[in-house]
């Protein structure tokens, strides 16, 4: 790594730190805090109880303060073993809460940057992808639900380490992947962990195809498999301290029953909600009596990414076919990544439709474990992930179009881009 690359990396890290600091600046500078429902009516008391037991050197198997008592460690939402939750034992809740949000926003941006960088091969374009992921409406709305917020943040890190372990197998990469998977599980949102494992398997198959099968190097993938299997076994061994009691608790819960009603209608996203990609407040605002959308509450269908990322995703769809083939006659890998995440975006959105889509019912009936989760809209996280990759590719291809040829030959690109920006910004300002 040369000096210029080191300087760029340092600036990018500083950029993510600055953006994260701006997001929590009212909490740092003015002593304010986000008074959110679940944060203060559930998570605060869970973390206070954890703090009390950590200080006394106790692993709290039982919580005597809730109803007539209930298992504590076995409840994944307690996230007792999540390392970043231990800051609540060192600081008062408001200080720890501020630091928790700051750290996770930074990690969301940096992890996505690390995932996108090998695809776009330009630091500042991958930085754009990181900013999209860390500031999208879905992630910000999940700050209320600290376990889900923390779990989502680890998604791009796991995918990045999965790719690195496959393409550059080593015991170090294998251990890092295993640790990342275990930490995401400890964060406490089982549905996000389940979706990550499900998507990770499909992503792994995609990587094997584009990097090995397509290049006729199928046998070369075999040495990587032992490192991936080792990572999975390491993660399983680590999480058993949480998984074993959670599984026992699950066997006594309503979700273990064959006739369990997941009430998926509460978080089934109506197809008209696709408009909120541009107009986040089209169906109302957060809060009681201020929202009239199809889902239970505003946050359940919140997935606004902003006008610029949306436009760059459209540009990627317009420009990808113009990217030249490589000397081997194949399209560049970035085209394969774009098409993969475009398809996965569509699948994730169809799943999020829940009861409005027959496809969801197929997943619900066929995929093991899928019927035990209540919120179909949680799959929207993969829409955000996909857009955080497609938008940087759209930006890269736009820059290539305007630099490789005479401007007059690319007038249609310039006019289209300018028109899209003008139209969407105008409508967004009026509607929002």
Q: At which residue positions do the language-model features occur?
A:
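Perimembrane helix-loop-helix junctions
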Residues: 196-235, 320-327, 331, 395, ...
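Transmembrane alpha-helices and membrane-interface helical segments
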Residues: 110-114, 118, 157-164, 200-208, ...
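Start-transfer (signal-anchor) and selected internal transmembrane alpha helices
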Residues: 1-26, 221-232, 314, 333-341, ...
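Membrane-interface coil-to-helix junctions
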Residues: 19-112, 131-152, 156, 251-254, ...
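Transmembrane helical bundles and short interhelical boundary loops of multi-pass, membrane-embedded
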Residues: 403, 407-432
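Hydrophobic, aromatic-rich transmembrane alpha-helices
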Residues: 306-335, 346, 350, 422
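Transmembrane signal-anchor helices characteristic of membrane glycosylation enzymes that use polyprenol
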Residues: 8-42, 231-248, 347-350, 425
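Membrane-embedded helix bundles of polyisoprenyl
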Residues: 16-19, 109-118, 123-211, 227-246, ...
């Amino acid at each position: 790594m040369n000096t210029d690359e080191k300087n760029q990396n340092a600036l990018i890290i500083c950029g993510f730190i600055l953006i994260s600091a701006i997001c929590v600046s009212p909490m740092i500078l003015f002593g304010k805090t986000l008074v959110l429902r679940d944060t203060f009516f559930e998570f605060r008391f869970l973390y206070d109880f954890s703090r009390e037991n950590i200080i006394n050197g106790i692993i709290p198997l039982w919580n005597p303060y809730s109803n007539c008592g209930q298992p504590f460690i076995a409840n994944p939402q307690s996230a007792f073993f999540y390392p970043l939750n231990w800051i609540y034992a060192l600081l008062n809740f408001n200080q720890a809460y501020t630091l928790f949000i700051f750290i996770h926003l930074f990690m969301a941006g940096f992890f996505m940057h690390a995932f996108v960088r090998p695809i776009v091969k330009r630091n500042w374009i991958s930085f754009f992808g990181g900013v999209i992921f860390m500031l999208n409406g879905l992630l910000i709305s999940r700050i209320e639900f600290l376990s889900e917020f923390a779990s989502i943040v680890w998604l791009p890190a796991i995918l990045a380490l999965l790719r690195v372990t496959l393409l550059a197998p080593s015991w170090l990469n294998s251990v890092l992947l295993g640790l990342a998977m275990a930490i995401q599980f400890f964060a406490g949102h089982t549905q996000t962990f389940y979706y990550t494992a499900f998507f990770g398997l499909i992503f792994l198959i995609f990587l094997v195809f584009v990097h090995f099968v397509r290049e006729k190097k199928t046998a070369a993938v075999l040495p990587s498999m032992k490192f991936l299997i080792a990572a999975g076994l390491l993660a399983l061994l680590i999480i058993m301290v949480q998984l074993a009691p959670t599984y026992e608790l699950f066997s006594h819960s309503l979700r273990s029953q064959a006739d369990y009603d997941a009430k998926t209608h509460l978080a089934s996203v109506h197809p008209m909600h696709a408009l909120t990609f541009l107009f986040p407040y089209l169906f109302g605002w957060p809060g009681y009596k201020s929202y009239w959308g199809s889902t239970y509450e505003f946050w359940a269908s919140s997935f606004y990414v902003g006008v610029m990322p949306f436009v760059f995703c459209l540009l990627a769809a317009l420009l990808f076919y113009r990217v030249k083939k490589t000397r081997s006659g194949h399209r560049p890998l970035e085209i394969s990544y774009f098409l993969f995440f475009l398809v996965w975006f569509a699948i994730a959105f169809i799943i999020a439709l829940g009861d409005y889509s027959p496809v969801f019912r197929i997943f619900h009936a066929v995929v093991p474990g899928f019927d035990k989760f209540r919120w179909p809209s949680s799959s929207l996280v993969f829409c955000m992930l996909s857009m955080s990759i497609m938008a940087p590719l759209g930006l890269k291809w736009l820059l290539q179009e305007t630099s490789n040829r005479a401007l007059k030959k690319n007038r249609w690109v310039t006019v289209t881009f300018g028109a899209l920006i003008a139209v969407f910004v105008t409508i967004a300002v009026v509607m929002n």
